[in-house]
Amino acid sequence: MKILVTNDDGVHSPGLRLLYQFALSLGDVDVVAPESPKSATGLGITLHKPLRMYEVDLCGFRAIATSGTPSDTVYLATFGLGRKYDIVLSGINLGDNTSLQVILSSGTLGAAFQAALLGIPALAYSAYLENWNELLNNKEAVEIMGAVVSSTASYVLKNGMPQGVDVISVNFPRRLGRGVRAKLVKAAKLRYAQQVVERVDPRGVRYYWLYGRDLAPEPETDVYVVLKEGGIAITPLTLNLNAVDAHREVDMDSLNRMVEYINASL
Protein backbone atom coordinates (compact mmCIF):
# COMPACT_ATOMS: atom_id res chain seq x y z
CA MET A 1 0.00 0.00 0.00
CA LYS A 2 1.22 3.49 -0.86
CA ILE A 3 0.55 6.09 1.84
CA LEU A 4 0.99 9.87 1.80
CA VAL A 5 1.48 11.61 5.15
CA THR A 6 1.12 15.40 5.33
CA ASN A 7 0.00 18.13 7.74
CA ASP A 8 -0.50 21.88 8.20
CA ASP A 9 1.83 22.42 11.20
CA GLY A 10 4.91 22.06 9.01
CA VAL A 11 7.44 19.39 8.19
CA HIS A 12 9.24 19.73 11.55
CA SER A 13 6.14 19.15 13.68
CA PRO A 14 6.32 16.30 16.24
CA GLY A 15 2.79 15.38 15.18
CA LEU A 16 3.95 14.67 11.63
CA ARG A 17 6.76 12.46 12.92
CA LEU A 18 4.31 10.52 15.08
CA LEU A 19 1.90 10.02 12.19
CA TYR A 20 4.74 8.78 9.99
CA GLN A 21 5.82 6.29 12.66
CA PHE A 22 2.25 5.07 13.15
CA ALA A 23 1.79 4.60 9.39
CA LEU A 24 4.97 2.58 8.80
CA SER A 25 3.31 -0.73 9.62
CA LEU A 26 0.60 -0.09 7.00
CA GLY A 27 2.72 0.20 3.86
CA ASP A 28 5.19 2.33 1.92
CA VAL A 29 5.05 5.86 3.37
CA ASP A 30 5.90 9.18 1.71
CA VAL A 31 6.06 12.35 3.80
CA VAL A 32 5.36 15.57 1.92
CA ALA A 33 4.53 18.59 4.07
CA PRO A 34 4.74 22.39 4.17
CA GLU A 35 8.16 23.80 5.10
CA SER A 36 6.55 26.02 7.76
CA PRO A 37 3.23 26.16 9.66
CA LYS A 38 0.24 26.71 7.38
CA SER A 39 -2.65 26.58 9.83
CA ALA A 40 -6.09 27.83 8.77
CA THR A 41 -5.28 27.73 5.05
CA GLY A 42 -8.22 25.46 4.32
CA LEU A 43 -8.40 24.12 0.77
CA GLY A 44 -6.30 27.00 -0.56
CA ILE A 45 -3.80 26.38 -3.34
CA THR A 46 -0.92 28.56 -4.56
CA LEU A 47 -1.43 30.15 -7.98
CA HIS A 48 0.42 33.49 -7.66
CA LYS A 49 3.99 32.20 -7.37
CA PRO A 50 6.03 29.07 -8.15
CA LEU A 51 6.28 26.25 -5.64
CA ARG A 52 9.48 24.61 -4.40
CA MET A 53 10.14 21.08 -3.13
CA TYR A 54 13.27 19.83 -1.39
CA GLU A 55 14.33 16.89 0.77
CA VAL A 56 14.91 17.23 4.51
CA ASP A 57 16.30 14.78 7.06
CA LEU A 58 14.01 14.48 10.07
CA CYS A 59 16.15 12.62 12.58
CA GLY A 60 16.25 9.30 10.81
CA PHE A 61 13.77 9.57 7.96
CA ARG A 62 13.57 11.65 4.85
CA ALA A 63 10.69 13.93 3.99
CA ILE A 64 9.94 16.40 1.25
CA ALA A 65 9.25 19.98 2.30
CA THR A 66 7.23 22.28 0.07
CA SER A 67 6.77 26.04 -0.01
CA GLY A 68 3.03 25.59 -0.50
CA THR A 69 -0.11 24.94 1.50
CA PRO A 70 -1.27 21.54 2.79
CA SER A 71 -3.58 21.31 -0.21
CA ASP A 72 -0.63 22.07 -2.48
CA THR A 73 1.33 19.19 -0.96
CA VAL A 74 -1.28 16.68 -2.11
CA TYR A 75 -1.16 18.12 -5.63
CA LEU A 76 2.64 18.13 -5.63
CA ALA A 77 2.98 14.60 -4.28
CA THR A 78 0.43 13.23 -6.74
CA PHE A 79 1.31 15.14 -9.90
CA GLY A 80 4.72 16.70 -9.22
CA LEU A 81 6.26 13.45 -7.97
CA GLY A 82 3.98 11.27 -10.07
CA ARG A 83 2.93 9.04 -7.17
CA LYS A 84 -0.31 7.07 -6.91
CA TYR A 85 -1.57 6.78 -3.33
CA ASP A 86 -3.99 4.35 -1.71
CA ILE A 87 -4.66 6.69 1.22
CA VAL A 88 -3.71 10.13 2.53
CA LEU A 89 -3.21 10.71 6.27
CA SER A 90 -3.12 14.34 7.44
CA GLY A 91 -1.93 15.47 10.87
CA ILE A 92 -1.47 15.00 13.68
CA ASN A 93 -2.59 18.58 14.27
CA LEU A 94 -1.66 20.48 17.42
CA GLY A 95 -5.13 21.58 18.50
CA ASP A 96 -8.53 20.08 17.80
CA ASN A 97 -10.34 20.54 14.50
CA THR A 98 -13.88 20.26 15.78
CA SER A 99 -17.00 22.01 14.39
CA LEU A 100 -17.75 23.02 10.81
CA GLN A 101 -16.46 26.49 11.67
CA VAL A 102 -12.98 25.08 12.24
CA ILE A 103 -13.11 22.22 9.73
CA LEU A 104 -13.79 24.53 6.79
CA SER A 105 -10.71 26.66 7.54
CA SER A 106 -8.38 23.89 8.71
CA GLY A 107 -5.27 23.17 6.66
CA THR A 108 -5.21 19.66 8.12
CA LEU A 109 -8.68 19.01 6.75
CA GLY A 110 -7.85 20.96 3.59
CA ALA A 111 -5.20 18.39 2.65
CA ALA A 112 -7.68 15.58 3.29
CA PHE A 113 -10.40 17.28 1.23
CA GLN A 114 -7.96 17.84 -1.63
CA ALA A 115 -7.11 14.14 -1.58
CA ALA A 116 -10.82 13.28 -1.62
CA LEU A 117 -11.35 15.56 -4.63
CA LEU A 118 -8.67 13.51 -6.39
CA GLY A 119 -10.47 10.29 -5.47
CA ILE A 120 -8.06 9.24 -2.72
CA PRO A 121 -9.43 8.05 0.66
CA ALA A 122 -8.31 10.48 3.36
CA LEU A 123 -8.25 10.71 7.14
CA ALA A 124 -7.38 13.76 9.25
CA TYR A 125 -6.08 13.53 12.83
CA SER A 126 -6.09 16.33 15.40
CA ALA A 127 -5.38 16.49 19.14
CA TYR A 128 -6.84 18.85 21.74
CA LEU A 129 -3.42 19.90 23.09
CA GLU A 130 -1.66 23.17 23.85
CA ASN A 131 1.84 21.74 23.36
CA TRP A 132 3.35 18.44 22.31
CA ASN A 133 4.98 17.74 25.68
CA GLU A 134 1.51 16.94 27.05
CA LEU A 135 1.49 13.92 24.75
CA LEU A 136 5.14 13.01 24.24
CA ASN A 137 5.75 12.64 27.99
CA ASN A 138 2.89 10.13 28.23
CA LYS A 139 3.84 6.76 26.73
CA GLU A 140 0.37 5.31 27.24
CA ALA A 141 -1.25 8.22 25.39
CA VAL A 142 1.14 7.82 22.45
CA GLU A 143 0.33 4.10 22.27
CA ILE A 144 -3.41 4.80 22.28
CA MET A 145 -3.05 7.42 19.57
CA GLY A 146 -1.00 4.99 17.50
CA ALA A 147 -3.63 2.29 17.90
CA VAL A 148 -6.36 4.65 16.68
CA VAL A 149 -4.35 5.80 13.66
CA SER A 150 -3.46 2.23 12.75
CA SER A 151 -7.00 0.90 13.17
CA THR A 152 -8.74 3.71 11.28
CA ALA A 153 -6.29 3.67 8.38
CA SER A 154 -6.14 -0.13 8.13
CA TYR A 155 -9.95 -0.32 8.18
CA VAL A 156 -10.22 2.09 5.25
CA LEU A 157 -7.40 0.38 3.34
CA LYS A 158 -9.12 -2.98 3.75
CA ASN A 159 -12.77 -1.97 3.31
CA GLY A 160 -12.62 1.33 1.44
CA MET A 161 -14.22 4.56 2.61
CA PRO A 162 -17.79 3.93 3.83
CA GLN A 163 -20.38 4.77 1.19
CA GLY A 164 -21.41 8.42 1.28
CA VAL A 165 -18.24 9.49 3.14
CA ASP A 166 -15.30 11.35 1.58
CA VAL A 167 -13.14 12.22 4.61
CA ILE A 168 -13.00 10.98 8.19
CA SER A 169 -11.90 13.44 10.86
CA VAL A 170 -10.49 12.02 14.10
CA ASN A 171 -10.13 14.30 17.14
CA PHE A 172 -8.30 13.19 20.28
CA PRO A 173 -9.08 14.58 23.76
CA ARG A 174 -6.46 16.18 25.99
CA ARG A 175 -6.14 13.15 28.27
CA LEU A 176 -5.66 9.77 26.64
CA GLY A 177 -5.67 6.82 29.02
CA ARG A 178 -7.00 3.31 29.32
CA GLY A 179 -10.77 3.32 29.14
CA VAL A 180 -10.99 6.10 26.56
CA ARG A 181 -13.48 5.26 23.80
CA ALA A 182 -14.10 6.38 20.25
CA LYS A 183 -17.54 7.71 19.37
CA LEU A 184 -19.20 8.35 16.01
CA VAL A 185 -20.57 11.91 16.02
CA LYS A 186 -21.46 14.77 13.70
CA ALA A 187 -19.56 18.05 13.59
CA ALA A 188 -20.98 20.93 15.61
CA LYS A 189 -21.74 24.10 13.65
CA LEU A 190 -19.67 26.44 15.84
CA ARG A 191 -16.74 26.08 18.24
CA TYR A 192 -16.01 29.75 18.96
CA ALA A 193 -17.76 33.09 19.22
CA GLN A 194 -15.74 35.15 16.76
CA GLN A 195 -14.21 38.40 17.94
CA VAL A 196 -11.88 41.09 16.61
CA VAL A 197 -9.48 43.12 18.74
CA GLU A 198 -8.31 46.49 17.46
CA ARG A 199 -4.95 47.90 18.55
CA VAL A 200 -2.64 50.73 17.52
CA ASP A 201 1.03 50.29 16.63
CA PRO A 202 3.80 52.75 17.71
CA ARG A 203 3.27 54.74 14.50
CA GLY A 204 -0.39 55.26 15.28
CA VAL A 205 -1.64 52.81 12.64
CA ARG A 206 -4.48 50.48 13.61
CA TYR A 207 -4.12 46.71 13.35
CA TYR A 208 -6.37 43.80 14.23
CA TRP A 209 -6.29 40.34 15.78
CA LEU A 210 -8.93 37.72 15.01
CA TYR A 211 -9.71 35.27 17.77
CA GLY A 212 -12.56 33.29 19.29
CA ARG A 213 -14.12 32.70 22.68
CA ASP A 214 -15.22 29.16 23.54
CA LEU A 215 -18.93 28.49 23.15
CA ALA A 216 -20.88 25.98 25.23
CA PRO A 217 -20.55 22.72 23.26
CA GLU A 218 -23.65 21.21 21.68
CA PRO A 219 -24.33 17.65 22.97
CA GLU A 220 -23.77 14.72 20.61
CA THR A 221 -21.21 16.60 18.53
CA ASP A 222 -17.47 16.36 18.02
CA VAL A 223 -16.85 19.38 20.26
CA TYR A 224 -18.86 17.87 23.12
CA VAL A 225 -17.24 14.42 22.87
CA VAL A 226 -13.69 15.81 22.90
CA LEU A 227 -14.03 18.71 25.35
CA LYS A 228 -16.71 17.46 27.75
CA GLU A 229 -16.71 13.67 27.57
CA GLY A 230 -12.97 13.25 26.99
CA GLY A 231 -13.62 10.79 24.17
CA ILE A 232 -12.23 10.33 20.68
CA ALA A 233 -14.54 11.90 18.11
CA ILE A 234 -14.91 10.09 14.78
CA THR A 235 -16.63 12.44 12.34
CA PRO A 236 -17.46 11.36 8.76
CA LEU A 237 -17.52 14.24 6.28
CA THR A 238 -18.69 14.73 2.71
CA LEU A 239 -17.54 17.08 -0.04
CA ASN A 240 -21.08 17.52 -1.32
CA LEU A 241 -22.08 21.14 -0.60
CA ASN A 242 -24.98 21.15 -3.07
CA ALA A 243 -28.18 22.09 -1.24
CA VAL A 244 -30.33 20.68 -4.05
CA ASP A 245 -28.55 17.34 -3.83
CA ALA A 246 -28.01 17.31 -0.08
CA HIS A 247 -29.54 13.87 0.52
CA ARG A 248 -26.88 11.20 0.34
CA GLU A 249 -26.94 7.57 1.39
CA VAL A 250 -24.40 6.93 4.13
CA ASP A 251 -23.32 3.43 5.12
CA MET A 252 -23.86 3.71 8.86
CA ASP A 253 -23.22 -0.01 9.35
CA SER A 254 -19.70 0.37 7.99
CA LEU A 255 -19.08 3.46 10.12
CA ASN A 256 -20.27 1.68 13.25
CA ARG A 257 -18.07 -1.32 12.43
CA MET A 258 -15.12 1.06 12.10
CA VAL A 259 -15.74 2.52 15.56
CA GLU A 260 -16.06 -0.99 17.00
CA TYR A 261 -12.77 -1.88 15.31
CA ILE A 262 -11.10 1.20 16.81
CA ASN A 263 -12.39 0.50 20.31
CA ALA A 264 -11.27 -3.13 20.07
CA SER A 265 -7.72 -1.85 19.55
CA LEU A 266 -7.74 0.29 22.71
Curated annotation (Swiss-Prot):
Reaction(s) catalysed (UniProt annotation): a ribonucleoside 5'-phosphate + H2O = a ribonucleoside + phosphate; a 2'-deoxyribonucleoside 5'-phosphate + H2O = a 2'-deoxyribonucleoside + phosphate; GMP + H2O = guanosine + phosphate; AMP + H2O = adenosine + phosphate
Thermal dependence, as annotated: Optimum temperature is above 90 degrees Celsius.
Cofactor(s) annotated in UniProt: Co(2+); Mg(2+); Mn(2+)
Predominant localisation class: cytoplasm
Localisation per UniProt entry: Cytoplasm
Any GO CC annotation of this UniProt entry: cytoplasm
Co-factor binding details: Binds 1 divalent metal cation per subunit. Most active with Co(2+), and may utilize Mg(2+) or Mn(2+), though with less activity.
Top-level division of the source organism's lineage: Archaea
UniProt binding sites for a divalent metal cation: 8-9, 39, 93
Example GO molecular function: metal ion binding
Keywords, comma-separated and alphabetical: Cobalt, Cytoplasm, Hydrolase, Magnesium, Manganese, Metal-binding, Nucleotide-binding
EC top class named in words: hydrolase
EC annotation from Swiss-Prot or TrEMBL: 3.1.3.5
Subunit structure of this chain's protein: Homodimer.
Family of the protein in this entry: Belongs to the SurE nucleotidase family.
Classification via NCBIfam families: PRK13934.1 (NF010544), surE (TIGR00087)
Role this protein plays: Nucleotidase that shows the greatest phosphatase activity on purine (deoxy)nucleoside 5'-monophosphates, particularly the substrates 5'-GMP, 5'-AMP and 2'-deoxy-5'-AMP.
Name the record gives this protein: 5'-nucleotidase SurE 1
Organism: Pyrobaculum aerophilum (strain ATCC 51768 / DSM 7523 / JCM 9630 / CIP 104966 / NBRC 100827 / IM2)
